[in-house]
From Swiss-Prot:
Domain spans labelled RdRp catalytic: 1104-1211
GO term, biological process aspect, one: DNA-templated transcription
Residues annotated for ATP binding in this entry: G605, A606, G607, G608, S609, G610, K611, S612
One Pfam family this sequence matches: Vmethyltransf
Protein's name in the database: RNA replication protein
Sequence ranges assigned to domain (+)RNA virus helicase ATP-binding in this UniProt record: 572-733
Domain Alphavirus-like MT: 60-224
Enzyme Commission number(s) of this protein: 2.7.7.48, 3.6.4.13
Family: Belongs to the potexvirus/carlavirus RNA replication protein family.
Length: 1323
């Protein structure tokens, strides 16, 4: 039907007017087609063109340019065009974008920056080499754009990008993700792309072309739902006044919004800040419906989306026929579906659809409900009752035919709109600095090898790189006259003055090493014949200028034969072992029988002397992608350095040593740092490739060399490459541009950098500095912890402004070459990290008893005294109270009034009489029973209550019978703590570290305590013998104030050696547990109240009921089942079997003076706290089903969580076989009934100490005259509540507020106001 505008044009009959209108229209069409030629220059079929026009993309019907996926490519270009209009007219950083696509962005001559990274192999051909960056991206622009790559990355990438680049404010990003893949539906735009679902993921095929396909995991589709990226961390800084570390919660929020959506291509904008974004993200019009289920089971229904128009047509068709057959519906369905749409439905889906409409066709569509039209008043009044009765009847008998018909027509709209979700990440590791808080220096971000030369780019800004650490001048510095005092010494190398200046040194200083020996910049001079090849004349000329003319060298067949033998027999290399057998046989034969000479130039010099500068200058002068030279490097890191310094040459110019053997080299071969290559490598290379005319070897004869670990290899018996080829080196450049003069001279090297040298030593590893470790294991562990770690020997080629060198027991084993390599890495600052024991007090403790050294592994060091600055004590400030003053006498008065007389509360024994736990005449002190080790009545009551005597055989039987229970406990513990599927490999370094921690903790005791334990340190002290003591303590639990005295707690005194051994085992498993521990579980071990407070604020949910738990007789209830659990857990951590067996032996045969103890937990056995905590977790998750996101806290037998757990029915079958009995409590999470944990109350404002318990404990200390000993600790506990201010009114009851005010008042009187509220928090 023509519109009114079209009708007006059709009413014009004058030929001239029509011609003029057509001419005007043609001009506009021509202009539009010219613009469309940029976006869509391809020939697109009719269906594709129609689909593109729906997306407002024009197709030129006369275009003949073909493309495998033209329609999808046109959408990509259109997205770039949209981005180009959105970008500001200022420099922008383009990520993952080819320079050739700038024309779609209409960017003009704006100096944009291109940074690309190789995410997948095809990126090698996609991006220009000079735009490739190898390390973390540094963005210096306000706006950036990521092109069609974000869907291959993880959400953390957005957080990293914004956190590491403080200038970045806006990020545009295009992604290619079909939204229908979220529901595993076929493509909604089959003319543009198709989707395959295979192998647990989906494959996006643009234009049905497999060559352009991308494979995705379903989790990649989450990019379509993210609305905000939230990263939370705590910024720890040192208070300049108090010197304490103060944590400030911080948050980075990046808001994301969908800007445009064209098919599977979507444009998003990411803006720094917490902004609004639509709750629902719409990608396409809702045009499909799903049918209700008519049959059982569910899969036998047409429960897939069907086009609403098609469904309506089929519905009307089946209801227009008097008699409907299956053939009719199949035929109509085939008629309505185009041929290209047939593959959208499987035969089974078509069958289910036909069955659905067959049912609908046979159901009665005539309404059989009561008709109100023209009915009587009585009928109208009773109609609702009749309707309800009918519904009730149909509920039992089933619906009528019309009711079924209506139910069958309740179609649901199938939508591709998605609800927006937030991506939230919280940093847990307190030692990990946040990028926004401590951006590393530029020198720390990039590793430079030897020298670096800047290169100007003509039309673009280069990707930001770190400044070169060891620059070498491009021009020869002018000769400076030597000082009169130095002139006598500098005459020693006057003949080499020109060569020295060609290397960038003045050579006019007399420098001496620490032994007083003169350091000469040129050393190890040899006279060799000169014989230059005809190739590379410019390079030969450059080498002659620095006295490095090549010489003719005969290849040593013995060395090449040994190397060829190792290659043939697969003794060395990784790639070489995978080569075909014929290739390896041929390689070995050439090594054995080839005899030849080759022109060689051997360049030796100290690190940073500029050995490779001339070579790199020559390679930069070559044409782009020249085939003149091949550079072979020992490591991938060194290869990357050469690629960055000589970017004009193709990537295959630079090869690692194995690729250099497999792939033929060019006629000029450079072996950089050849001392790190396997012995015999240069000879074997020349023997196999006769096209090599010039061999250049650069290295340092003073640094570490390759060490062949396979002692069966033939090359293991050869002298190193350095030792053999040194005879062909004309001289050694004993000077450096890298190290400052003081450091260079200490290493016996000449240097002219007059900068101060800083050397420090501590036990702390700094963040951001490269770490050098003596061995591979330590370096590997440090690297896994996020450190930039190298071995002493493997750091060759590294240049950094400052490095830290780890010292341990392996350091003295390193050779002089290795130590020289490590010490020469830094420019001007070295930090030594000493992880071993030190200090005079340490050795005093070690010598105080004769047995400590028998089981402690230690090495002695001399500690350099450090000057300590004096801290000025801040002036005391007046504290403003925010609670009304209360009468302190009324807090404990109710307990005093109910308290019975002394002997009514004491325990009584016929043999020993009354116990003596109620002491003094002070009624407040009498509230707290005082349990003492010398109280025999209490001691025997405790033994009767806490200990059970049995035999070793009964314990072993108990242990064996509970293995199945132990398995169940560990399975649930494994799931709760998210441990890996496979057992954790044993880490010897971590074990040693834990061992050192246990030893350090023990030796931190005062000398008197260590001497008192001399008997337990005796090797003759029986391993399984235990001495029992009664723990002396004041019982301060609020629920026990003024109550009858209860049995106390025992302390078990074991032999010291097994205590430390099993303590090491527990600490080792704790460290491993912390690696995998989920963030919603908090274990109060080595944590502070501030840590608990921070965690509770971030994780605890106060909306429902909370749960807490304690146990009855927790220690003595840990029977054979818990021991089995401990053993299985230890085996999962690959603890050595002899340690596990000895632990089982100790637990099943623990002897006291009464006999063998039943299997139980004993305080003092080593792993008490860790074992108690882990047993509590295992028991809790075995008894209850706990959702994965529930916040949980554990410490020993105490635990709590923010939701009530669901009991497992299966637990009832095993609870009788477990000795543990829990005491669960439910909390309403309102004032007076919040969850409690270890004396802390978890409130919406944070955790606070139980005010009544804190007040009672403080009163006991005050009345005993011990307030000065506990005031500081109690002030810290009360401070968390005090600093909440008036917020306390919302979390405390009247009685709790009363106790809190009285506690604070007493602490103020004790001069602890600065602890209650730090100086920085005062008004």
């Amino acid at each position: 039907m023509a519109t009114r505008v079209a009708s007006v044009f059709s009413s014009l009959t004058d030929v001239g007017i029509k011609a003029a209108l057509q001419d005007e229209a043609y001009k506009r069409i021509k202009s539009n087609l010219r613009e469309a030629e940029i976006i869509n220059p391809y020939s697109v079929d009719a269906r594709g063109a129609e689909a593109l026009e729906e997306l407002a993309i024009i197709t030129n019907p006369h275009s003949i340019r073909l493309h495998t996926h033209a329609a999808a490519k046109s959408i990509e270009n259109q997205m770039l065009n949209i981005v180009g209009h959105a970008l500001p007219k200022e420099p922008v950083t383009f990520l993952f974008l080819k320079r050739g696509k700038l024309r779609y962005l209409s960017r003009g001559r704006i100096k944009d920056i291109f940074q690309n990274q190789e995410i997948e192999p095809r990126d090698v051909a996609r991006y220009e080499h000079k735009t490739i960056v190898q390390k973390s991206l540094l963005l210096n622009t306000r706006v950036a754009y990521i092109s069609d790559t974000l869907h291959f990355l993880r959400p953390r990438y957005i957080i990293d990008l914004f956190s590491q680049n403080v200038f970045l404010d806006v990020l545009y990003a295009t992604v290619v993700l079909p939204v229908e893949a979220s529901f595993k539906h076929p493509s909604q735009n089959p003319a543009i792309y198709t989707i395959n679902y295979n192998y647990g993921g989906f494959q996006y095929l643009p234009g049905n072309h497999g060559g352009g396909a991308y494979s995705h995991e379903f989790e990649d589709l989450d990019w379509l739902k993210y609305g905000k990226f939230i990263y939370r961390w705590v910024d720890y800084r040192t208070d300049p006044i108090s010197g304490k570390r103060v944590g400030t919660p911080k948050e980075l929020v990046v808001t994301c919004q969908l800007v445009e959506s064209l098919g599977a291509n979507h444009l998003f904008i990411f803006k720094r800040g917490d902004l609004k974004t639509p709750r629902v993200r719409t990608f396409a019009k809702d045009k499909s419906v799903t049918f209700p289920d008519l049959f059982y089971p569910e899969e036998e229904n047409a429960n897939f989306p069907v086009d609403a128009e098609l469904a309506t047509k089929l519905f009307l068709y089946v209801k227009t026929l008097k008699t409907v057959t299956s053939q009719d519906v199949h035929g109509k369905l085939r008629q309505l579906l185009r041929s290209d749409e047939l593959t959208r439905f499987s035969p089974m889906q078509l069958t289910h659809m036909v069955n659905y409409f067959m049912v609908v066709a046979h159901l009665d569509s005539c309404n059989d409900y009561s008709m109100l039209l023209g009915s009587s008043v009585w009928t109208q009044l009773t109609a609702p009752i009749q309707s309800k009765l009918r519904k009730l009847t149909e509920f039992f008998k089933g619906k009528s035919s019309f009711g079924k018909f209506c139910a069958a027509l309740k179609w649901k709209t199938a939508t591709y709109s998605l609800e927006v979700v937030d991506y939230v990440e919280t940093r847990r590791d307190s030692f990990e600095p946040h990028p926004l808080d401590s951006l590393p220096d530029a020198d720390d971000r990039d590793v430079n090898y030897d020298t670096d030369v800047s290169e100007d780019e003509a039309d673009e800004k280069p990707a930001p790189k770190a400044p070169t650490s060891t620059p070498v001048p491009d021009t020869t510095p002018p000769a400076s006259p030597a000082a009169p005092a130095d002139a006598e010494y500098t005459q020693c190398w006057a003949a080499w003055d020109t060569v020295i200046r060609k290397h960038g040194f003045k050579g006019n200083q007399a420098q001496f090493d620490d032994d007083g020996n003169l350091i000469t910049p040129i050393a190890e001079i040899k006279s060799l014949p000169k014989d230059s090849p005809r190739c590379a004349p410019e390079l030969i000329k450059s080498l002659q200028e620095i006295a490095r003319t090549p010489t003719l060298v005969e290849i040593d067949s013995k060395r090449s034969n040994a190397f060829g033998s190792d290659v043939k027999n697969g003794r060395i290399g990784m790639i070489l072992k995978k080569q075909p057998n014929d290739w390896r046989l041929s390689f070995a034969a050439k090594c054995e029988h080839t005899s030849r000479k080759v022109h060689a130039c051997v360049i030796h010099g100290a690190g940073g002397s500029g050995k490779s500068q001339r070579l790199q200058d020559w390679m930069r002068s070559l044409k782009k992608n020249s085939r003149e030279c091949t550079v072979i490097l020992p490591t991938a890191e060194l290869r990357t350095d050469w690629v960055n310094k000589v970017p004009k040459q193709s990537l295959d110019t630079f090869k690692t040593w194995e690729k250099g053997l497999v792939q033929p080299p060019n006629r000029v071969v450079i072996l950089d740092d050849y001392g790190k290559l396997p012995a015999g490598y240069p000879e074997a290379l020349c023997a196999n490739y006769p096209n090599i005319e010039l061999l250049i070897l650069t290295g340092d004869s003073r640094q570490s060399v390759h060490n062949e670990h396979n002692k069966q290899a033939a090359t293991a018996s050869l002298e190193s490459n350095i030792e053999f080829w040194t005879q062909y080196c004309r001289f050694y450049v004993n000077a450096t541009h890298r190290n400052v003069k003081r450091l260079a001279n200490a290493l016996g090297v000449y240097g002219e950098r007059d900068e101060p040298l800083k050397v420090t030593c501590s036990s702390h590893v700094y963040d951001g500095w490269p770490v050098l470790a003596p061995g591979l294991l330590k370096a590997g562990n440090l690297a896994e912890c996020g450190r930039r770690a190298f071995t002493y020997a493997g750091c060759q080629g590294l240049t950094a402004p400052r490095v830290q060198i780890l010292l341990d027991n392996d350091t003295p084993l390193c050779s002089q070459r290795v130590m020289y390599t490590a010490l020469s890495r830094a420019v001007n600052e070295i930090h030594f990290v000493n992880t071993g024991p030190s200090g005079d007090d340490f050795w005093t403790k070690l010598d105080c008893t004769p047995f400590l050294k028998t089981f402690l592994e230690l090495s002695r060091e001399i500690e350099i005294p450090e000057a300590k600055c004096q801290e000025t004590a801040p002036a005391e400030a007046t504290v403003k109270t925010h609670f009304p003053v209360e009468n302190p006498n009324l807090v404990l008065e109710p307990y005093v009034e109910k308290m019975a007389e002394k002997f009514d509360r004491e325990l009584y024994s016929k043999e020993y009489g009354y116990s003596n736990a109620i002491q003094t005449e002070d009624p407040v002190i009498q509230l707290f029973p005082h349990q003492q080790a010398k109280d025999d009545t209490l001691m025997w009551a405790t033994i009767d209550q806490r200990l059970a005597i049995t035999t070793k055989s009964e314990n072993e039987t108990e242990f064996a019978l509970k293995k199945d229970i132990g398995d169940l406990l560990f399975i649930n513990y494994h799931r709760a703590m998210k441990l890996p599927k496979n057992p954790i490999p044993f880490d010897k370094d971590l074990w040693q570290s834990c061992k050192n921690e246990v030893q350090k903790t023990y030796l931190s005791k005062d000398v008197g305590s260590i001497v008192n334990g001399v008997a337990r340190q005796d090797p003759d002290f029986p391993i399984n013998e235990i001495k029992l003591f009664l723990k002396s303590q004041w019982v301060k639990k609020v629920e026990k104030l003024g109550m009858v005295v209860k049995p106390g707690q025992t302390i078990a005194s074991f032999a010291q050696a097994p205590v430390m051994l099993y303590g090491t085992m527990a600490r080792y498993m704790r460290r491993m547990r912390e690696v995998y521990q989920p963030s919603n579980i908090f274990i109060n071990c080595e944590k502070t109240p501030a840590d608990l407070d921070e965690w509770a604020k971030a994780n605890w949910n106060f909306e429902g009921l909370a749960h807490s738990n304690d146990f009855t007789a927790f220690d003595q209830s840990q029977d054979g089942a818990m021991l089995q659990f401990e053993v299985i857990k230890a085996k999962f951590h690959n603890i050595p079997s002899d340690i596990i067996n000895s632990y089982v032996e100790l637990k099943t045969n623990a002897k006291v003076f009464l006999g063998v103890l039943k299997i139980m937990r004993l305080s003092g056995e080593g792993p008490t706290f860790d074992a108690n905590t882990e047993c509590s977790i295992a028991y809790h998750h075995t008894k209850y089903w706990v959702e994965p996101d529930v916040a949980q806290v554990y410490a020993g037998d105490d635990s709590a969580q923010d939701r009530t757990p669901v009991p497992r029915p299966s637990f009832n079958k095993i609870k009788d076989r477990l000795g543990l009995v829990s005491k669960p409590l439910t909390h309403r999470q309102v004032p007076g009934d919040f969850a409690t944990f270890c004396g802390w109350i978890i409130t919406p404002k944070g955790v606070i100490k139980d005010p009544l318990k804190l007040y009672a404990s403080l009163q006991l200390a005050i009345r005993r005259g011990k307030s000065h000993e506990v005031a500081l600790s109690y002030a810290h506990d009360a401070g968390l509540a005090y600093r909440l201010g008036d917020d306390l009114h919302s979390v405390l009851t009247f009685d709790e507020a009363h106790a809190h005010q009285c506690t604070v008042r007493d602490l103020v009187k004790l001069n602890k106001v600065e602890v209650l509220r730090p100086i920085w928090a005062l008004d």
